[in-house]
């Protein structure tokens, strides 16, 4: 007799980290991952403000189109998630409004 209630191994979850260098290549990777329900961490620490603005604008549009979300982790790191993934913030800190003002500073 087969036990249908036996624990089954879960598929491994994936998450991708992008440190943008080339808009065309990196934007495609971000979109492809999100379309495949893979969350993306975008690290803009070493990205020019102009390039960072384009990447974040693209990521915001992509996540909106798939009913996903973008959360800012710190000044230069963002987490983009498909609708199948929920980011739970530290309950001790109130949820902050999105502040992308650093993207608009002049070079």
What are these regions (language model features)?
Residues 1-40, 45, 60, 64, ...:
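Positively charged, small/polar-rich N-terminal and surface patches that mediate targeting and assembly
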Residues 49-51:
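Short, solvent-exposed loop/turn segments at secondary-structure junctions
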Residues 55:
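Acidic, glycine/polar-enriched metal-coordinating patches/loops
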């Amino acid at each position: 007799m087969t036990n249908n209630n036996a624990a089954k191994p879960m598929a491994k979850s994936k998450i991708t980290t992008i440190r943008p260098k080339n808009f065309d290549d990196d934007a495609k990777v971000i979109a492809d991952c999100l379309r495949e329900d893979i969350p993306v961490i975008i690290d803009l620490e070493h990205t020019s403000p102009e390039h960072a603005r384009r990447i974040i604008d693209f990521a915001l549009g992509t996540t909106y189109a798939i009913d996903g979300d973008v959360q800012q982790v710190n000044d230069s790191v963002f987490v983009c998630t498909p609708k199948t993934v929920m980011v739970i913030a530290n309950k001790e800190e109130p949820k902050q409004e999105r502040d992308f003002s650093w993207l608009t500073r002049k070079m």
